[in-house]
Amino acid sequence: MKYALKIIHKAQKDLDSIKGKDFNFIKKKILSLSSNPRPFGCNKLIQEEGYRIRAGNFRVLYRINDFEKQVIIYRVKHRKQSYR
C-alpha cells in the first residue's frame, strides 16, 4: 500500500537550497519512500524518533506514521551536518 508523503517546512527550505543533480537524486529517493518507507539501507535513528536514508552526500531524515500511512520528511542535510 502506498504511503502519503508530507514535507515539513524546514525540509522544504533544505530542498530549496539544493540544486542540480543532487536535487534530482534526493527527489527520486524521497518519492521511492511512498512505496517502501523502510528500504534496504535505511537506518533507525537512536537519539530521536525516525529514520535516515542516504541520498548521495545528503541524508533524508523522516518519520513513518503507519496508522495514517504517512511518511513525514522533516530534514534534508548534507552528511557533514547530519552527524553533528
Predicted segments, located by residue:
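A short, surface-exposed loop/turn module that caps and links secondary-structure elements
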Residues: K28-R54
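Enriched for short, Lys/Arg-rich terminal
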Residues: K2-N24, A55-F58, R63-R84
